Amino acid sequence: MEKTCIDALPLTMNSSEKQETVCIFGTGDFGRSLGLKMLQCGYSVVFGSRNPQKTTLLPSGAEVLSYSEAAKKSGIIIIAIHREHYDFLTELTEVLNGKILVDISNNLKINQYPESNAEYLAHLVPGAHVVKAFNTISAWALQSGALDASRQVFVCGNDSKAKQRVMDIVRNLGLTPMDQGSLMAAKEIEKYPLQLFPMWRFPFYLSAVLCVFLFFYCVIRDVIYPYVYEKKDNTFRMAISIPNRIFPITALTLLALVYLPGVIAAILQLYRGTKYRRFPDWLDHWMLCRKQLGLVALGFAFLHVLYTLVIPIRYYVRWRLGNLTVTQAILKKENPFSTSSAWLSDSYVALGILGFFLFVLLGITSLPSVSNAVNWREFRFVQSKLGYLTLILCTAHTLVYGGKRFLSPSNLRWYLPAAYVLGLIIPCTVLVIKFVLIMPCVDNTLTRIRQGWERNSKH
């Protein structure tokens, strides 16, 4: 073998396989990048082009022929052209008969056509073995070698031998083939590169709605109300003070919403007396988004920490502290030290620090590189047991912050309670229901149901 692929980590290194010729139809960015990668890994590459004489920028060592001549050189042909230009393949039906056609194309939008591109290709050339692959790898990644985050290649096809040959090529290129089954899976594979954060939409939309609602709520209480009754201009609070109330409330609410669907699912299973009935679609989607909800919540918690750290350097805080000091000096008064206030203040800060530490720990363990290194019991312990402990600490942090002001009528403005009171509704609800669910009389029944027992079983 004259060349070896530096980036390749193949499972099997068969010399005869590495010397085989691969044909690539199309000389665009992806076709050239894939051809270069194959040349580096020892394959012979033949490009098929409609204008072989005018083709430029191809990797050295590759041969360029017409489509029909190039197809005769190899048993595997990679179709690196768009679906709109597949029609010419019908003219090569006899040449392509019995060959493996690898469809790598993607569409501009999801469900652009009634069938997948691979199925359409199989319909155009019924005598060929069509395999879908390489559509999740970009040309830039192939050229730069930046494949650490995208080494997985989804492969599907109706012919198992053809699919296996393509998967061998994928391995020899240093990538990881993922067998997705028959060609019917091609439609889902083609949707994958076109999706834009599908599991992040609900968390983003929900957090945006919460932030907007809390912003207007705080503006009404802290800006409009003082202006109406006291003629005070508190608009400067919209820069730091109000966001520093919105972010922790949103973080705590989203964290509670991570564990609320699990509580609802447990109640449904107890009510139904079985685990063999499917959850509603909205609950199923909600449970699938829990990781994203938690990470968005962690982001808001980080913002809360950053905004809190800048409080001492704010002009308003320095002015208020200096003005209070001068006033006390003029009046010759001093505030006596309050042990109870010191306890409340230190407890509030300590609970916040511990809660944020566990919050960060939850975020770290949700990373694929970390979650793959622990077993299921360890992962469940961190995400469930420590997760609820995090929720308890963060809720206690907010409760201690409120102190005695929860029941104070002077804290109501236009009969509206402080924003942090709203932020405690969902977390406290989740914790109360969870406390009921972990009681032995309830937990034992729930455990039996999740192990397959049915209340109304006929067997």
From Swiss-Prot:
Homotrimer. Interacts with PTK2/FAK1; the interaction may regulate PTK2 phosphorylation. Glycans are attached at residue 323. GO terms for biological process: copper ion import; fat cell differentiation; iron import into cell; protein homotrimerization. It is a multi-pass membrane protein. Belongs to the STEAP family. Its main location: membrane. Its EC number is 1.16.1.-. This is Metalloreductase STEAP4. Heme b binds at residues 304, 397. FAD binds at residues 140, 148, 269, 290, 366, 383. Integral membrane protein that functions as a NADPH-dependent ferric-chelate reductase, using NADPH from one side of the membrane to reduce a Fe(3+) chelate that is bound on the other side of the membrane. Mediates sequential transmembrane electron transfer from NADPH to FAD and onto heme, and finally to the Fe(3+) chelate. Can also reduce Cu(2+) to Cu(1+). Plays a role in systemic metabolic homeostasis, integrating inflammatory and metabolic responses. Associated with obesity and insulin-resistance. Involved in inflammatory arthritis, through the regulation of inflammatory cytokines. It catalyses: 2 Fe(2+) + NADP(+) + H(+) = 2 Fe(3+) + NADPH; 2 Cu(+) + NADP(+) + H(+) = 2 Cu(2+) + NADPH. Residues 247-395 form the Ferric oxidoreductase domain. GO terms for cellular component: early endosome membrane; endosome; endosome membrane; extracellular exosome; Golgi membrane; membrane; nucleoplasm; plasma membrane. Fe(3+) binds at residues 217, 307. Induction: By TNF and IL1B/interleukin-1 beta in adipose tissue. Up-regulated by androgens, including testosterone and dihydrotestosterone (DHT). Can also utilize FMN. Can also utilize riboflavin. Its cofactor is FAD; heme b. The gene is STEAP4.
